Amino acid sequence: MVVDDLGEDDFLYPVMIHQETYVTRVIDKMHGGGSTDLPIWFFTPRLNDMPVKRNITAWPTVVFVRGSGFGPQTVLDYLNYYVRIAERGYVVAALQYRSSNIAPFPAQMQDCKTAVRYVRKHAKRLHVDVNRIGLWGDSSGGTTVLQAGFTGDSGPDTDVYSEYSAAVNCIIDWYGVTDMTAMNYYPNIMDNNSPDGPIGKELGGISVLDHPDLAAAASPITYLRRDVPTPPTLIMHGGRDSDVPFNQSCRLFRRMKELGKEVSFIKLNDGTHGYYGFRTNRAMDIVDMYLQSHL
């Protein structure tokens, strides 16, 4: 069979993938000692293979943090997310953070900020527009991008690449924990007050009930201030989430509204934690439209 009339090309950008190390962190002796190299994967639109040449030298960029209950991540599990956004015309930088078993809070938010600064430091080589950078994360990654985005260049922080800013244009939070002090107020399958639960481990292996001040310090909602600028934020949460209660997003949305912050909230009615609903084209379209309007 010969196809003669091919019609018009309507495919999106082909995507190149490569991996780098964005920082080497020292691990304290209490958590085993030594050091760890933290990788970051870049997904970049490829112009050379486009049927019509386009004069683009720098792309809007999304730094993505994959959720893991603050434990070890399997970053490339979300390959479909990264590629499906990158092919629409974004650089996606998917980072690995230190897991809570070797470095509890505030390690993850510090790693996220360091990754943003690394992207800015190497912007020309990576074809990144330094003035158009957003954060996106799911679950504990959502918590991390909220922490990092709400605090920007203020603490908790590190001095790695400190000559570059960690501030971002927008944040996309998919079903992240927003108030660690209130996780057990609503039904879920986790014991979030236990030292052995994800939040207890993130706080250093302690009980949330015994250390409410530390739990509050690790909660993104704590860092909202009326007189401090906050990046526009898109919240998306599944109505059937049994891991992170839907109310966590409600609490954040309500607080941001009270403080006059720019925030959008989308409920995926039958969405569960990280699966049904979030891998659909509709969800990707929502993310893309939000990024287009804020980057």
Model-derived regions: residue spans:
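Alpha/beta-hydrolase superfamily serine-hydrolase fold, recognizing
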Residues: 1-295
